[in-house]
Amino acid sequence: MDKPRKENEEEPQSAPKTDEERPPVEHSPEKQSPEEQSSEEQSSEEEFFPEELLPELLPEMLLSEERPPQEGLSRKDLFEGRPPMEQPPCGVGKHKLEEGSFKERLARSRPQFKGDIHGRNLSNEEMIQAADELEEMKRVRNKLMIMHWKAKRSRPYPI
């Protein structure tokens, strides 16, 4: 019990230091020569990036340094500088904007792709029947996935 008190009493006495005991203040990096700065930067890089990782990170660091700063560009200027998009983003294309069900669109597109169906003489009815089968398979698959999802999460504890 006496030891912790003595240690606590010694600490306040050693806390205030005079100007003579303080280490000399280092000069700001602005006043140092470029050679001193580069050696300090190298040592700090070595601390943060071990030599094994340095070759992997080097190309990324070089690429980031070569980029010209884009100062003073407003959002408007950035958008004007970009070329217009050739195709709309996914989900906004023609196939989503066309009216009609999947089967109707498939039947309409058949004449466009006649050359792609090599030697197949499919009538519109056959194509619609195949589309019905595909839709049925999708529905069954989705039902099974939902049932599986519910079964996994209905337990009081994870499996």
From Swiss-Prot:
Region called Disordered, residue ranges: 1-121
Transmembrane segments: none
Compartmental location: Nucleus
Keyword set, alphabetical order: Nucleus, Transcription, Transcription regulation
Entry annotated with the keyword Transcription: yes
GO cellular component entries: nucleoplasm
Main location: nucleus
Biased composition (Acidic residues): 37-54
Biased composition (Basic and acidic residues): 17-34, 64-80, 95-119
UniProt cross-references to InterPro entries, sorted A to Z: TF_A-like/BEX (IPR021156)
Chain's role: May be involved in transcriptional regulation. Modulates various viral and cellular promoters in a promoter context-dependent manner. Does not bind DNA directly.
Similarity comment: family membership: Belongs to the TFS-II family. TFA subfamily.
Protein name: Transcription elongation factor A protein-like 1
Organism field: Gorilla gorilla gorilla
Upper taxonomic lineage: Eukaryota, Metazoa, Chordata, Craniata, Vertebrata
